[in-house]
Amino acid sequence: MPAQYGHPASSTRAKGLSRPLVPLALAFCLGIVLEERLGLGPAAWMLVVGVCLVGAGAARWSGPHGLVLPLLVLGFGCLGAEAMAGALFGYPANHLSRLPEVWLDAPLPLEGWVVGPPDPRPADSRDLADPARTRFVVEVTRLGFEEGWVPTTGQARLTVLGEVGEVAYGDEVRGSFRLRRPRRFDNPGGFDYPRYLATQGIALEGWTRDPVEMLGASRGSPVLAAIFRLRALLLRRLDGAMPAPEAALLKATILGDRSGLTPEMNQAFLDSGTYHILAISGLNVSLLAGALFGLFRLLRASPRIAAFASMLLVTLYAGLAGAGPSVVRAAVMSDTYLLAVVLDRRADLLNSLALSALGLLWWNPRDLSDVGFQLTYLATLGIVLGLPRCDRVLAGVPRLLRISPSREKTSSRQSGPCPR
């Protein structure tokens, strides 16, 4: 892709303000970490942000001008801390996370609406005690107590054991669930399940064997509802077009739906070390973005129109794939790069990477502690910084002895997350 079409600057020697978003993004991340450790609350950080903005404005107009950038970086760090403080302390009194322990682990009526596509799981043919189940995340709007219904906020991850009717995004549901706080296993250094759910805004888990009442479909975004309806249609078409094993694999690798995978299939992928093939990640999204851009250019669309159309379709695909965290991250990163082409700006990959990180962390600062988020950005950073160095090292090597470009990218990607 020619440079005027937003080709990334291959050199990483840019200095000064050529990449202004990189120090701002790093400061934002540092602020998130500091607030998580110190727990000062949003008011203190906003006070410092105000001081930094006033100081930067004064330095800009009357000097010393050298203080403008440091004050802006400090201000962005405090904005990151304030965003994290809001995520930690910004819950209202009626939030699910504040529900007293006395109401947990006992049947409690609730109402809410489904905020994402459901995750149905078939019964385990090897274990009669493992019934079919449907799991979905609900934005709880009311809890039922002896005194009556009480308005509530917060999300819960609910599981209905046994057969349940069709559940879709935006559906309002009512049922009696046993709620509990997410539990962490005691394995040292093991997976922190409560923290993982917290990054997704989920405060409680719940389950029931009782029927769940559907109250209608009147919540949520009409656009998302249409995308998820299209996703459900595609899943049904795949089921009807081919046998179960093949359909299950296609649904998992293309649309992110693993509900059709049997326990035997899951175990086979785990035993072979290839389970990651089933996960939709940045590779899928970047290949799609590149293919779409190339297709539109072949159709003689201008670079800006091709990039804009590719952005729309990549965003649509993220929804069709279930809008999981990894897919959304990859879509945001691809769209950020394509946006530079739309704006007719020379795309610098480090700046694009920093901008996407700022957007994601502003929306949900808890993502910074998510291992998937960290690995995604470290691997991408490894590619951005590693490929130019690989090219320079291999410049003097005869062509027949060089490694393929795909292996260069693989080595660079793996070097990013490697411990030093």
Question: Where do the language-model regions lie?
Answer:
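Membrane-interface helix/helix-cap signal primarily in integral membrane proteins
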Residues: P2-K15, P70-H276
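Membrane-embedded alpha-helical segments of integral membrane proteins
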Residues: G16-R60, D370-F373, Y377
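Small-residue packing motifs within transmembrane alpha-helices
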Residues: L21-P23, A27, M46, L71-L79, ...
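Hydrophobic alpha-helical transmembrane segments in multi-pass membrane proteins
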Residues: P23, G31, H65, G206, ...
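Hydrophobic membrane-targeting signal helices
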Residues: F28, L34, G57-R60, G80, ...
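Membrane-interfacial entry segments at the cytosolic side of transmembrane helices
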Residues: G41-L47, W61-L74, S302-R304
